[in-house]
């Protein structure tokens, strides 16, 4: 945060996964409390139905209900339209994060890497490589 202030950035973009919306909300609050203007975009931006890309009801988390697919390119485009100066990713899926980086015009960093098995702390597996995970890796 202090590095971004030192670099003169005022307008931050936050691209986050819907599964980490609370974490995204808290991060945005913290950035605003430190004087940044914050624009955010959730992963389901654009509301494109999964059926539009050929997925069926059996592919949905909640069959029978409207379920938009993740759209990291739309997230990037929304933040581009808002002319963010620096973007922060919170929990985008592997692959989705790469698409976001590709299409975002502002420099981007990742604050939280999605890893539900390790409470979004993938380094935890490395810390435990010689103990708990020794026989699992």
Name each model-derived stretch:
Residues 1-2:
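Short, small-residue-biased leader/transition segments that mark boundaries at the very start
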Residues 66-81, 92-94:
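Active-site glycine-rich loop that binds ribose-phosphate moieties when present
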Residues 10, 85-86:
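Conserved acidic residues
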Residues 34, 103-107:
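Short, structured coil segments at secondary-structure junctions
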Residues 16-24, 46-47, 87-98:
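Gly/Ser/Thr-rich loops at beta-strand to alpha-helix junctions
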Residues 22-72:
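Long, charge-dense
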Residues 109-137:
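C-terminal functional extensions of proteins
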Residues 41, 90, 111-114:
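Generic beta-sheet signal
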């Amino acid at each position: 945060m202090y590095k971004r202030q030192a670099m003169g950035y005022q307008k931050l973009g936050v691209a986050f996964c819907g599964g980490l919306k609370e974490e995204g909300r808290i991060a945005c609050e913290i950035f605003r409390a430190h004087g940044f203007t914050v624009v955010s975009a959730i992963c389901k931006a654009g509301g494109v139905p999964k059926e539009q890309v050929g997925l069926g009801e059996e592919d949905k988390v909640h069959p029978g209900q409207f379920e938009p697919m993740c759209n990291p390119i739309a997230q990037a485009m929304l933040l581009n339209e808002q002319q963010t100066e620096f973007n922060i990713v919170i929990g985008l899926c592997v692959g989705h994060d790469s698409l976001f980086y590709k299409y975002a015009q502002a420099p981007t960093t990742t604050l939280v890497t999605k890893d539900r098995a390790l409470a979004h702390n993938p380094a935890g597996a490395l810390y435990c490589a010689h103990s708990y995970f020794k026989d699992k890796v």
